[in-house]
Amino acid sequence: PGELCQSDFTDMKALGVTILGKPFDHLVYHFVLTYSNWETGTICFSESFESLSGGFQNGVWELGGVPEKHRTDRLTAAVQKPDNPEEFTQRYRALLKHYGLQGQKTQPASPNENGDVEQRNYRLKKALEQSLMLRGSCDFISRQDYAVFLKKLFVQLNAGRRDRFKEEVDLLRRLPVKRFDSCKRLQVRVGPSSTIRANHNVYS
């Protein structure tokens, strides 16, 4: 109890969620405590470090404490390429250090090592699909409206895990004084048409 948490990104496109009638293609960063299966999630749009960091931190701050270890699959936002001498990326190492965590990654072609969260991904989508059917619509008035709906679902899913969750919470370590700053700061030049280029994208 209180030792290991796992996380993963899961694609929610197949559920057909819409915002004011427009398709809302998104991912959920899914965070799970492996002993109790307590879970939570954060809406995001890419498997970037910012999404990983934001989702992880939302998870532990909602928990109110920090487990000993965090395991992911071989996300490029966290894990270096095989030919790199460092196991994890610099920014992910900084995140682990900030929370005093031991990082773990799955071995190549062994997603079963992240099995708890992989199984919860499947069950989350099934539960969300059923909740949307009971609601009678997959359309929401805003992203926040959908986020509240998703949050209520996590509360329902966690309701039957209270006893084992209590065992975990009692063993979690204290949170740091503040969150880790996961923003990426860029120095850019303004182009001739009042545009800027950042991360290979042009913005006006």
Task: Give the residues covered by each predicted segment.
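Active-site beta-loop-alpha junctions of metal-dependent nucleic acid enzymes
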Residues: 24, 41-69
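RNase H-like two-metal-ion nuclease catalytic core shared by retroviral integrases
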Residues: 83, 103-126, 142
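Active-site-proximal acidic segments at structured loop/helix or strand boundaries
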Residues: 121-204
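Basic, flexible linker segments flanking DNA-binding modules
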Residues: 1-16, 90, 166-179
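RNase H-like polynucleotidyl transferase catalytic core
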Residues: 93, 98-114, 134-137
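Mobile-element integrase/transposase regions
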Residues: 1-39, 50-54, 185-198, 203
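Acidic/histidine-rich, metal-coordinating catalytic segments
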Residues: 65-84
